[in-house]
UniProtKB/Swiss-Prot annotation:
Biological process annotations from GO: dimethylallyl diphosphate biosynthetic process; isopentenyl diphosphate biosynthetic process, methylerythritol 4-phosphate pathway; terpenoid biosynthetic process
Binding site for [4Fe-4S] cluster: 12, 96, 197
Taxonomic source organism: Enterobacter sp. (strain 638)
Pathway given in the UniProt record: Isoprenoid biosynthesis; dimethylallyl diphosphate biosynthesis; dimethylallyl diphosphate from (2E)-4-hydroxy-3-methylbutenyl diphosphate: step 1/1; Isoprenoid biosynthesis; isopentenyl diphosphate biosynthesis via DXP pathway; isopentenyl diphosphate from 1-deoxy-D-xylulose 5-phosphate: step 6/6
Binding, isopentenyl diphosphate: 41, 74, 124, 225-227, 269
Catalytic site positions: 126 (proton donor)
GO molecular function (one): metal ion binding
Family as reported in the entry's similarity comment: Belongs to the IspH family.
Top-level class of the enzyme under EC nomenclature: oxidoreductase
Enzyme Commission code(s) on record: 1.17.7.4
UniProt name for this protein: 4-hydroxy-3-methylbut-2-enyl diphosphate reductase
Length: 316
């Protein structure tokens, strides 16, 4: 049985930065460190940080005065940010810079009095944070998930209308929604550059190449990870059997029985150790050496806040 690895796969720059912020805060300030929401959507990462002293909460009221609070990579609304400011807390922001870019687009639209439409999944923390950047009572902020939602959407003034997208969506599905928006609201304005982040786009492109060769695709990622779910859906859409798994223990022998080629990828919040464990399990089930496919090289790095740079503190 051949094992192919999608390239790129796994951690993106925003996830790397968010995890480093929590790890460095624990090292510098000591436990406990409070984190609003799971810092990234991966069970292994969250449990590892919890064991080191991170406490994951959903409400700012759960955080004691005089402690450290970190916002997750998904971002928070202005209301949450203001609530944290009103408290005696030291706050660090692990929001992915590419999510912050979308926040700024919404805030600009709000200041200009434009109505805004966000393409995204209801209930996802990134969506809640992005929707919460809009504050103009004269305008409006709307959420759509599908072309069908666009057909039933009513706005106040379609001459002053803009759209943004969640960063972890399906590229294909989002394109369909944007087409529907432009058809329904011809004057709508979108971002200069697509809001779907480079890592989401690259990993979907990579899983497309993987699914062309593999009989079965395993996506390493947690069930609440938006970008991981999109990878599994894309492989399935290409006619391949695909499974979203937290780790190697989820693999069932029947999935790969009599299979010639298994493809493995990982969502942007899944660490490489989980991929290595999956490879080891597949090799126990008859797999050969893992062969990485060619793909886009990623060199993007997002710096952690200066106060949390371990190297800088050591130099001082």
């Amino acid at each position: 049985m051949q094992i192919l690895l999608a390239n790129p796969r796994g951690f993106c720059a925003g996830v790397d930065r968010a995890i480093s912020i929590v790890e460095n805060a624990l090292e510098i300030y000591g436990a406990p460190i409070y984190v609003r929401h799971e810092v990234v959507h991966n069970r292994y990462v969250v449990e590892s940080l919890r064991e080191r002293g991170a406490i994951f909460i959903e409400q700012i009221s759960e955080v004691p005065d005089g402690t450290i609070l970190i916002f997750s990579a998904h971002g928070v609304s202005q209301a949450v940010r203001n609530e944290a400011k009103s408290r005696d807390l030291t706050v660090f922001d692990a929001t992915c810079p590419l999510v912050t870019k979308v926040h700024m687009e919404v805030a600009r639209a709000s200041r200009r009095g434009e109505e805004s439409i966000l393409i995204g999944h209801a209930g996802h923390p990134e969506v809640e944070g992005t929707m919460g950047q809009y504050s103009n009572p004269e305008g409006g902020m709307y959420l759509v998930e599908s072309p069908e939602d666009v057909l039933t959407l009513n706005v106040k003034n379609d001459a002053k209308l803009s759209f943004m997208t969640q960063t972890t969506l399906s590229v294909d599905d989002t394109s369909d929604v944007i087409d529907a928006l432009r058809k329904r609201f011809p004057k709508i304005v979108g971002p200069r550059k697509d809001d779907i982040c480079y890592a989401t786009t690259n990993r979907q492109e990579a899983v497309r190449a993987l699914a062309e060769q593999a009989d079965v695709v395993l996506v390493v990622g947690s069930k609440n990870s938006s970008n991981s779910n999109r990878l599994a859906e894309l492989a399935q859409r290409m006619g391949k059997t695909a499974f979203l798994i937290d780790d190697a223990t989820d693999i069932q022998e029947a999935w790969v029985k009599d299979v010639n080629c298994v493809g493995v990828t990982a969502g942007a919040s899944a660490p490489d150790i989980l991929v290595q464990n999956v490879i080891a399990r597949l090799q126990e089930l008859g797999g050969g050496d893992a062969i990485p496919l060619e793909g886009r090289e990623e060199n993007i790095v997002f710096e952690v806040p200066k106060e949390l740079r371990i190297d800088a503190r050591e130099v001082e």
